[in-house]
UniProtKB/Swiss-Prot annotation:
CC terms in the record's Gene Ontology section: cytosol
Quaternary structure and partners: Homodimer.
Keywords associated with the record: Glycosyltransferase, Transferase
Family (UniProt): Belongs to the thymidine/pyrimidine-nucleoside phosphorylase family.
Entry EC number(s): 2.4.2.4
Catalytic activity: thymidine + phosphate = 2-deoxy-alpha-D-ribose 1-phosphate + thymine
Annotated source species: Mycobacterium tuberculosis (strain CDC 1551 / Oshkosh)
UniProt cross-references to PANTHER family, sorted A to Z: THYMIDINE PHOSPHORYLASE
Enzyme class: transferase
Entry keyword Transferase: yes
Signal peptide feature range: none
GO BP, one annotated term: pyrimidine nucleoside metabolic process
Protein name (database record): Thymidine phosphorylase
Length: 427
């Protein structure tokens, strides 16, 4: 069907009024937007209509396929490697990719990880890694192949992989259209299918700091993505994981890199270590790699060695100090007791206000901005002790950050309920 059969206002009205978009309409609007024939304002209206009206499974599958078809698709089937990848739907303090990728590589897997930048209140893996002096995520397809063979892993910008999603991803970030199951599922799977991994494990976050707040929503998202992977011949499974509280003790780009290095050195927060090892086990099993102990790679330093090699291969210099905000403020305890729940959304928004995230596409982030959490839920608190430290290069940001954080934590007489880190497993 020719382009003359469609126009943006008609497609927008169809979805606005609760109609179903045809395969041809989806193919046209995704391609036309990628080519610049549909304006940002028009696509913003369509995205908002999708947020409100939703999409059925057929529409989601076609939207995913249209974004996948918008660019190149990597193919590693000729390499003597078991390729496998992981993707998180986005959380607060979610630095898991940084220790996970080298752990899996040290166990014999090859991980081609096409990663993104911060979206909304959640941090982006590329923003974190680019806080390392010299690190570049812009790799050619050939360089990705070479690095998989040499290092066993590459973490790179999607580039020409699903360029339609790259434009939509940036637009959703500034138009209040992030929290949509069809848009999240299609965004993730178009990139992941394009990167050519032979298997995929999904970390679907659920809770206040996730895009899916309820387990029902998260399970629906997980099932949708597992089905999309299977339909394209990529074995896919998902873990539903807790995101009511931030992961670890840091939220922000360089702060999270430093914490990931602690994990790779054999330490680090228990929840970050637990999730890293659980996801590594799932990835190795799905890739058909057996008899390897992911935890051993943290104990013997082989995972750290892989991370150093990966960073060096991509121009990074870990001998240079990581940046930290030139100004800091500390939130202290006004009473003694036990740290209650910490709301992940509140902390994520505070870090965003401090400069760790962006408010428009292409804006620069402050690599040294963020929040350090001194007391986790259930830990004892003494009056006057530091609970959070806020970092930024722009001290005028502290007021807005404190306002976001206020009400997002409490001090109690008794410990809060302990929630399991792994909520469910979808295969």
């Amino acid at each position: 069907m020719t382009d003359f059969a469609f126009d943006a206002p008609t497609v927008i009205r169809t979805k606005r009024d609760g109609g179903r978009l045809s395969d041809a309409a989806i193919d046209w609007v995704v391609k036309a937007y990628t080519d610049g024939r549909v304006a940002d304002e028009q696509m913003s209206a369509l995205l908002m209509a999708i947020v409100w009206r939703g999409m059925d499974r057929g529409e989601i599958a076609r939207w995913t396929a249209a974004m996948l078809a918008s660019g190149a698709r990597l193919d590693f089937t000729d390499l003597p490697l078991a390729t496998v990848d992981k993707h998180s739907t986005g959380g607060v303090g979610d630095k898991i990719t940084l220790p996970l990728v080298p752990v899996v590589a040290a166990c014999g897997g090859a991980v081609p990880q096409a990663s993104g930048r911060g979206l909304g209140h959640t941090g982006g893996t590329l923003d974190k890694l680019e806080s390392i002096t010299g690190f570049t995520a812009n790799l050619s397809n050939q360089r990705v192949r070479e690095q998989l063979c040499d290092v066993g892993a590459a973490i790179f910008a999607a580039g020409q992989l699903a360029p339609a999603d790259a434009k939509l991803y940036a637009l959703r970030d500034i138009t209040g259209t992030v929290e949509s199951l069809p848009l999240i599922a299609s965004s993730i799977m178009s990139k992941k299918l394009a990167e050519g991994a032979g298997a995929l494990v999904l970390d679907v976050k659920v809770g206040s700091g996730a895009f899916m707040r309820s387990p029902v929503q998260a399970r629906e998202l997980a099932h949708t993505m597992v089905e999309l992977g299977a339909a394209h011949g990529v074995p896919t499974r998902a873990l539903l994981t807790e995101m009511n509280c931030p992961l670890g003790r840091t939220v922000g780009n360089a702060l999270e890199v430093a914490e990931a290095l602690e994990v790779l050195a054999g330490g680090g927060p228990p929840d970050v270590v637990e999730l890293t090892l659980r996801l590594a086990g799932e990835m190795l099993e799905l890739a058909g790699i057996h008899g390897r102990d992911p935890a051993q790679t943290l104990r013997d330093g082989t995972a750290m060695d892989r991370f150093r090699r990966l960073v060096a291969a991509q121009g990074g210099d870990l001998s240079k100090p990581l940046p930290i905000g030139s100004h800091s403020e500390t939130v202290t305890a006004g009473a003694s007791g036990t740290m209650g729940d910490i709301d992940a959304m509140a902390v994520g928004l505070a870090a965003w206000r401090l400069g760790a995230g962006r408010s428009r596409p292409g804006a620069r982030v402050q690599h040294g901005a963020g929040v350090r959490i001194h007391r986790r839920p259930g830990e004892p608190v003494v009056v006057g002790e530091p609970l959070f430290t806020l970092y930024t290069n722009a001290p005028e940001r502290f007021g807005a950050a404190r306002a976001e954080l206020a009400g997002g934590w409490s001090i109690r007489d008794s410990p809060p309920q302990v929630r399991p880190l792994i909520v469910d497993r979808i295969v």
